[in-house]
Amino acid sequence: MVTEGLKPHISIKKKKRKSGFLARMRTKSGRKIIARRRRKGRKRLAP
């Protein structure tokens, strides 16, 4: 029997460092992601 809904939790610090707003702004491709999310009208641009 397989249980579903349990996923590994990453620490908030690791999440922010990897995929936070400032991390996105550091790279060209990250800036493209932010621009794309702005165009789409996302309320949250980065987690």
UniProtKB/Swiss-Prot annotation:
<feature type="compositionally biased region" description="Basic residues">
    <location>
        <begin position="10"/>
        <end position="47"/>
    </location>
</feature>
<keyword id="KW-0689">Ribosomal protein</keyword>
<dbReference type="GO" id="GO:1990904">
    <property type="term" value="C:ribonucleoprotein complex"/>
</dbReference>
<comment type="similarity">
    <text>Belongs to the bacterial ribosomal protein bL34 family.</text>
</comment>
<keyword id="KW-0687">Ribonucleoprotein</keyword>
<dbReference type="GO" id="GO:0003735">
    <property type="term" value="F:structural constituent of ribosome"/>
</dbReference>
<feature type="region of interest" description="Disordered">
    <location>
        <begin position="1"/>
        <end position="47"/>
    </location>
</feature>
<dbReference type="InterPro" id="IPR000271">
    <property type="entry name" value="Ribosomal_bL34"/>
</dbReference>
<dbReference type="GO" id="GO:0005840">
    <property type="term" value="C:ribosome"/>
</dbReference>
<protein>
    <recommendedName>
        <fullName>Large ribosomal subunit protein bL34</fullName>
    </recommendedName>
</protein>
<dbReference type="GO" id="GO:0006412">
    <property type="term" value="P:translation"/>
</dbReference>
<dbReference type="Pfam" id="PF00468">
    <property type="entry name" value="Ribosomal_L34"/>
</dbReference>
